[in-house]
Amino acid sequence: DAAALSAFEVVIKSPGISAYASPKVDAELHGVRFTSGTAIWFAENAGAHTVCVTGTKGKSTVTALVAFLLRAAGERTALAGNIGLPLLELLDVQPPPDAWAIELSSYQTCDAQRPAVAVVLNLFPEHLDWHGSEARYFADKLKLVTDAQPGIALLNGADARLREVGNALAARGQRVQWFNTDDGWHVRDRWIMRGGRAVIDVKFLPLPGRHNWVNLCAAMAAVEALGIDPVPLAQPFLRRPHLPQ
């Protein structure tokens, strides 16, 4: 409880403990400072090459796909955060990975710092008991792009709320890129498209359902945002030998 926590100067908080309720709020009144495994990792790995992914739905799939594609590109890539190993267990990995694919929940997004690419997939009300309100949940989720100072904010252009946020970010100088738009990576007529170019027939994908095809679009866009052509990297993922020309 708050009284017990007041015996400590700094407490490493589990993500599942709400930032907006007791015991954290009450302990802070007694001068206790809180941090998290996520915050510690980013502070200790300020130069890490990270792709951070959040969203109400699909973030585990997209993070895993990003790691798959980067590994196919020859990048030693760690899968971490809300998927794979907890960040606190990866403070001093030797040799360090070339890249990190990190899944972040709404409990963790406020602690990320300067990812190379920050991906927000979608927003639906969730975890309201932790956040206290729908508005606060959305705001906390969006801290990955509004507060974390990403190199590139990659957003779902088909989500009206994310479109509004992205336009506001771009107006203040943030680099913003989009997926799920006609000029980017998107799904059309059972094809994965890059703008007007048909790239992958979805019948060759082991991922069922349109939502997963959009997830693949997000991952392809994230890798592309790093300056890597994702098309040849998807080759081992398909159930046939060659991508269409």
Regions found by a protein language model. Name each.
Residues 3-6, 15-175:
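Phosphate-binding loop of NTP-binding sites
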Residues 5, 131-135, 167, 174-245:
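Adenine nucleotide phosphate-binding catalytic loops in nucleotide-utilizing enzymes
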